[in-house]
Amino acid sequence: MDRRSRAQQWRRARHNYNDLCPPIGRRAATALLWLSCSIALLRALATSNARAQQRAAAQQRRSFLNAHHRSGAQVFPESPESESDHEHEEADLELSLPECLEYEEEFDYETESETESEIESETDFETEPETAPTTEPETEPEDDRGPVVPKHSTFGQSLTQRLHALKLRSPDASPSRAPPSTQEPQSPREGEELKPEDKDPRDPEESKEPKEEKQRRRCKPKKPTRRDASPESPSKKGPIPIRRH
């Protein structure tokens, strides 16, 4: 009896289960479960793939930025190309140096010519007699480089002292030291006796005349004298022949 009763109970339970959940509904439920699970799995896979792609892109960007920063850091130390550039710059500087040397040579030549002209002027002043009026050396025009400082400053001072002495001596000068042009009116003619008025050299009228003549001579521009290497002057010797090699 027990077995039969148990069998009947299982049947009733099955019928009750079938009534509550029929087989079609059960199959649909299982299908929906499978679909929902598969959709969830697909979504998880998609998100994982997207995250993996994002990580790969970020790694690529980081690697690119790191490589760029490394290349920029390597530029700062001197490379062989920069050393060659420095060598080229040094070569350019060495090439530019001869121009400065040429400029210095030209400047030396100008100073030599100036010293020669000053020596010539000294010799000319020494050859002239002491009674002749001396003129102050003309100041040379200022170059672009600035005013040229005269080297023979003592010579200029001596000239000014001589001029001052001549000015002081001009009223008291004797007829023997006066220039030859002033001696002619003062020299006595033949057969005439000297008067006491003529003998007085301190006459203001006579002292004014040599002063005026001296001033005229000072105002006249002095012709530049050049020393010839040959003893004979070119006027006596004639035109200088040109030698053609």
Curated annotation (Swiss-Prot):
Keyword terms: Cleavage on pair of basic residues, Cushing syndrome, Cytoplasmic vesicle, Glycoprotein, Proteoglycan, Secreted, Signal
Pfam families recorded: NESP55 (PF06390)
Compositionally biased tracts (Acidic residues): 101-129
Biased composition (Basic and acidic residues): 187-215
Record-level GO BP terms: female pregnancy; negative regulation of multicellular organism growth; positive regulation of cold-induced thermogenesis; protein secretion; response to parathyroid hormone
Region described as Disordered: spans on this chain: 70-245
Post-translational modification: Binds keratan sulfate chains. May be proteolytically processed to give rise to a number of active peptides.
Family per record: Belongs to the NESP55 family.
Name this protein carries in UniProt: Neuroendocrine secretory protein 55
Organism: Homo sapiens
Gene field: GNAS
